[in-house]
Curated annotation (Swiss-Prot):
Induction: Expressed in the late phase of the viral replicative cycle. This is Transmembrane protein EP84R. Keywords: Late protein, Membrane, Transmembrane, Transmembrane helix, Virion. Coiled coil: none annotated. Belongs to the asfivirus EP84R family. It is found in: Virion membrane. The chain crosses the membrane at residues 31-51, 59-79. It comes from African swine fever virus (isolate Pig/Kenya/KEN-50/1950). One of its GO terms (cellular component) is membrane.
């Protein structure tokens, strides 16, 4: 039965129809994770500026908390790919 193989054989497969899509999926997860981290760092920076400059402390703190959650998701995607 060709579909009862171990998952490690799919990951290390040299067949283009099996190996390349998995490799592309793994790279895209890493790229998405890095993009999420960069966006979250920018949002944290903007949130800190909002907190320090203006009187919109609620909006700034919500922005910082949401960006920390977003960055945690990006870090999780990168960490999961590397483990």
């Amino acid at each position: 039965m060709p579909y009862s193989r171990d998952i490690t054989k799919f990951i290390t497969a040299t067949e283009p129809e099996v190996g390349l899509p998995l490799l592309a999926l793994q790279r895209s997860k890493s790229v998405i994770g890095i993009i999420l981290l960069v966006i979250s760092l920018l949002l944290i920076f903007i949130g800190i500026i909002i907190l320090s400059v203006s009187s919109h402390t609620t909006a700034g703190s919500v922005l910082v908390v949401l960006s920390l959650i977003l960055g945690g998701g990006g870090f999780f995607l990168i960490y999961k790919d590397n483990s």
